[in-house]
């Protein structure tokens, strides 16, 4: 006898990326061969070998497809979270809109899982907290300091924002984190823990410390600073 495997389908997607926001726009940009790698400010990387990164464009630099957190997140709430959480909230809204999923009943809410991964979490907020503590003293820290950078709070904020009460997860497995989140979500559905799962990954780790650390590990491109679009060369023999 064959083993019956529960079928799982993707019904909605959302994205915040260096190519901009919105699945359709980003997909068309990829098909056109566009690169999202750009040069970083000299102030940030003056003494760091790598001068380029995949920076998410702001709504000011790209009025059509730039990142606009205020369209999704109240200004007061933004003060309580790192940028990676903002990315998750904006991408999640697009995915849920595309899927048409707005659980209203308690049963639907309890059967909706949230699994959002990150490799590092709120790196910038951690660094800011260290700076504040060193320069101004520990009493100057906000009560929201810890929640602002915890790796699991991307999933936490998304589930709270949409009223999900099902299983929650936050894989922290470096570069494999986003892929693991998708796998974990699929297993939750297949095992019967959930009927619906919102899953993915979010990262916002462009900071002098992270750039310097990865550069020290020789994990960043340093040969194409004047040609950012050529910096990502995964199959280049040199």
Describe each model-derived feature in a short phrase.
Residues 1-77:
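ACP-dependent fatty acid/polyketide chain-elongation machinery
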Residues 2-5, 21, 32-42, 78, ...:
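Acyl-thioester C-C bond-transforming condensing/cleaving domain
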Residues 13, 117-119:
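Structured loops at beta-to-helix junctions and adjacent beta-edge loops in soluble globular domains
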Residues 15, 81, 171:
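Generic anion/oxyanion-binding catalytic loop in active/binding sites
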Residues 25, 29, 84-91, 177, ...:
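Generic hydrophobic secondary-structure packing signal
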Residues 43-101, 151-165:
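A glycine- and small-residue-enriched flexible loop/hinge segment at structural boundaries
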């Amino acid at each position: 006898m064959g083993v019956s495997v529960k079928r799982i389908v993707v019904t909605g997607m959302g994205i915040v990326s260096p190519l901009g926001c919105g699945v359709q726009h980003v997909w068309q940009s990829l098909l056109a061969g566009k690169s999202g790698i750009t040069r970083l400010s000299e102030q940030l990387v003056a003494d760091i070998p790598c001068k380029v990164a995949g920076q998410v464009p702001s709504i000011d630099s790209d009025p059509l497809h730039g990142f606009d957190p205020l369209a999704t997140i109240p200004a007061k709430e933004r003060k309580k979270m790192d940028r990676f959480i903002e990315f998750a909230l904006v991408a999640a809204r697009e995915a849920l809109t595309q899927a048409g999923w707005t659980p209203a009943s308690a049963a639907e809410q309890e059967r909706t899982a949230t699994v959002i991964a990150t490799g590092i979490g709120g790196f910038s907020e951690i660094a800011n907290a260290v700076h504040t503590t060193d320069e101004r003293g520990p009493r100057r820290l906000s009560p929201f300091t810890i929640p602002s950078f915890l790796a699991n709070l991307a999933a936490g904020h998304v589930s709270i924002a949409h009223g999900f009460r099902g299983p929650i997860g936050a894989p922290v497995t470096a570069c494999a984190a986003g892929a693991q989140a998708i796998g974990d979500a699929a297993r939750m559905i297949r095992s019967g823990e959930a009927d619906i799962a919102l899953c993915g990954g979010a990262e916002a780790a462009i900071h002098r410390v992270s750039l310097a650390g990865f550069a020290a590990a020789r994990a960043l491109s340093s040969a194409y600073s004047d040609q950012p679009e050529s910096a990502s060369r995964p199959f280049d023999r040199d």
